[in-house]
Amino acid sequence: MVKVFIAGASAPGTYPISELPSRIRVGAGESIDIVAIVLPGASCEMPLTMDIDGEGAEVNLSGLYICGSEEKVTFDLNVHHNAGGTVSRQLFNGIAGGSSRAAFHGRIVVRQDSQKIKAFQENHNILLSEDARIETMPQLEIYADDVECSHGATTGFLNAEEQFYMRSRGIPEAEAKVMQAISFLSPVVARIDDEELRGAVAALVEDAVRSLSF
C-alpha cells in the first residue's frame, strides 16, 4: 500500500512529511511505495536515500509540490541499486509561482555487480511567474551493462493553445488554467492505490491549486 506524506495540510491516512525517514533499506522481494506532497505555505527539505539491497525489491517514489509565494522546497533523492533484479521509479511534478524556489535533485546509482536493473526517473515543472525558480538535476550513475534506465526533466509554462481551446468551449480563462494545473499534477495523485485516500488527497491538491495566482 502507498504511504502518503504531506507538508502544509493533513488528511486521514496520511503522515507529516517530517516523519519520513531520511534513509530506508529495502530487502529482497520487498516493495516500498511513497508519495510526498508539499502544499502552498510549506517550506521543507526532503532528503531521502533508498538502499535497494535485495533481489526482487521494488521502490516507487512519487511527489508533487505546489508553491505560490515565497516557499522554499527541496527534494534530495538518492536511490542505490545494490542488488541485481531490482526496480525503481521516480515521478515528481511541481508548480511554482510568486518568488518561490523549488529544487529536485535526483540521483540513481547502479553498482557494477547489479545487473538486470530497471530504473526510471522523471521531474516535470511549471512556472507561474517570472520570479519563481525551479532547479532540476536528474542524475544517473550506471556501472553495470545489463540495465534499462532513463531519466528526464522539463520546466515550462501552462500551455496557451490548450487554454485557447478550452476558452473556445466556453470555459473561463481562470478555470482553464486551474484545470491544466490539476491535470499536470494528477499522475502523481493517481499513484495512490487506496480510492478513499486518493480522493481526499485530490481534494487537497485542487484546493491548493485554486489558491494560486495565475
Regions found by a protein language model. Give the residues of each.
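Conserved beta-strand/loop scaffold segments within soluble protein domains that form the structured core
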Residues: 1-164, 168-171, 185, 192, ...
